[in-house]
């Protein structure tokens, strides 16, 4: 059997370990496991969303509204744009895939940060494209511009706030870069934008401003993080109609379920839940910062719902993450990104209490 030879260059993406896997591997009861690896909203889902989904549960036998009118209307109102500027994906990573398939081929190249969301590379390699990386995990846009002029990439990825590091760009800094980049498709991934904008208004990217001024830019958002809908898989892209029209040619029919559409639409209506989740996140974030300072860890100032601990040479992130896992604490080891670091989702007070207690035990042993 013959497979596409481009697959030989691709590593399988490894998502954060689910609670069920830890139950099977270590025999730990689910209630004794805390998952701080996938940057889900630890406060769950808005009760209004849960009620709305229950109300339509008996319609699951019917295909969803493929026009996605209600959700697009809600997004259009939120961002003061036309519905024709919006495409909905099964998570924003599906929109990423549409972009890669629409633009790239074996003669293409893609520019991204040295350390950033792994799916950018995977989708590019699936199309046979070449990867160009900056020299630093931060988005040094002066270096990005130099690489753009040298290599003329077909897609430029800018993740702000960046995953898995948590740092974010000032909006004006990004706009000054975009002013000088007209040819490639620039993908601005704002999966954690709700958090960044709360912490520092200068970090807020307004997608309506992007599409008015930059027809070659697409902004990505998601309901998986602040809105607490990771299990429903809903994301969106906002761009000039000329871009959205091309991406629609790649969208399969009925790619978003009825329940997911209702959940996302209702989530947009409950800003109180989102605001509460974000406020609590940054209150708890202070504890992670203080813990790092007390234990001599470096960390990256985070504009998200996670923090990245940069560990000293004598402490290996792989060993620490495995030790935590055996005790029922799931965090993300960043060895695969070339970093001796742990990415830790900021949980609830109770989850964090337990994390710090167990992490102290692990640090005393390793």
Curated annotation (Swiss-Prot):
Gene Ontology molecular function: histidinol-phosphate transaminase activity; pyridoxal phosphate binding
Obligatory cofactor(s): pyridoxal 5'-phosphate
Keywords recorded for this protein, A-Z: Amino-acid biosynthesis, Aminotransferase, Histidine biosynthesis, Pyridoxal phosphate, Transferase
Annotated catalysed reactions: L-histidinol phosphate + 2-oxoglutarate = 3-(imidazol-4-yl)-2-oxopropyl phosphate + L-glutamate
Pathway: Amino-acid biosynthesis; L-histidine biosynthesis; L-histidine from 5-phospho-alpha-D-ribose 1-diphosphate: step 7/9
InterPro entries xref list: Aminotrans_II_pyridoxalP_BS, Aminotransferase_I/II_large, HisP_aminotrans, HistidinolP_aminotransfase, PyrdxlP-dep_Trfase, PyrdxlP-dep_Trfase_major, PyrdxlP-dep_Trfase_small
A Gene Ontology biological process term: L-histidine biosynthetic process
Enzyme Commission identifier(s): 2.6.1.9
Cited Pfam families: Aminotran_1_2
Assembly and binders: Homodimer.
PANTHER family: HISTIDINOL-PHOSPHATE AMINOTRANSFERASE, HISTIDINOL-PHOSPHATE AMINOTRANSFERASE 2
The protein's name in its UniProt record: Histidinol-phosphate aminotransferase
Organism name: Nitratiruptor sp. (strain SB155-2)
Gene that this polypeptide is encoded by: hisC
């Amino acid at each position: 059997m013959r497979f596409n030879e481009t697959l030989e260059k691709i590593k399988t993406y490894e998502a954060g370990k689910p609670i069920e896997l830890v139950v099977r591997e270590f025999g730990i009861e689910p209630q004794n496991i805390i998952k701080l690896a996938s940057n889900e909203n630890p406060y769950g889902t808005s009760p209004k969303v849960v009620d709305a989904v229950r109300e339509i549960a008996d319609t699951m036998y019917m295909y969803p509204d493929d026009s996605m009118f209600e959700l697009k209307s809600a997004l259009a109102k939120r961002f003061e744009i036309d519905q024709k500027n919006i495409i909905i994906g099964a998570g924003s990573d599906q929109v990423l895939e549409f972009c890669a398939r629409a633009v790239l081929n074996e003669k293409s190249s893609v520019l991204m940060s040295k350390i950033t969301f792994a799916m950018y590379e995977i989708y590019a390699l699936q199309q046979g494209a070449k990867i160009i990386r900056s020299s630093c995990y931060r988005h040094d846009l002066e270096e990005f511009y130099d690489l753009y002029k040298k290599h003329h990439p077909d897609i430029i990825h800018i993740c702000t706030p960046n995953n898995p590091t948590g740092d974010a760009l000032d909006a004006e800094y990004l706009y000054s870069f975009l002013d000088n980049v007209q040819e490639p498709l620039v993908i601005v991934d704002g999966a954690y934008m709700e958090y960044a904008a709360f912490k520092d208004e200068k970090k807020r990217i307004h997608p309506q401003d992007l599409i008015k001024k930059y027809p070659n830019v697409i902004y990505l958002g998601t309901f998986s993080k602040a809105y607490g809908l990771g299990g429903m898989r809903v994301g969106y892209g906002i761009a000039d109609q000329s871009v959205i029209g091309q991406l629609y040619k790649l969208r399969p029919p009925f790619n978003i379920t009825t329940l997911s559409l209702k959940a996302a639409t209702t989530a947009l209506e409950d800003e109180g839940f989102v605001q509460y989740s974000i406020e609590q996140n940054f209150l708890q974030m202070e504890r992670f910062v203080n813990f790092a300072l007390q234990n001599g860890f470096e960390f990256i100032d985070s504009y998200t719902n996670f923090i990245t601990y940069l560990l000293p040479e004598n402490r290996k992130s792989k060993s620490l993450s495995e030790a935590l896992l055996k005790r029922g604490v799931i965090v993300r080891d960043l060895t695969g990104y070339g970093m001796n670091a742990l990415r830790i989702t900021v949980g609830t007070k109770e989850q964090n209490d337990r994390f710090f207690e167990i992490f102290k035990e692990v640090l005393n042993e390793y």
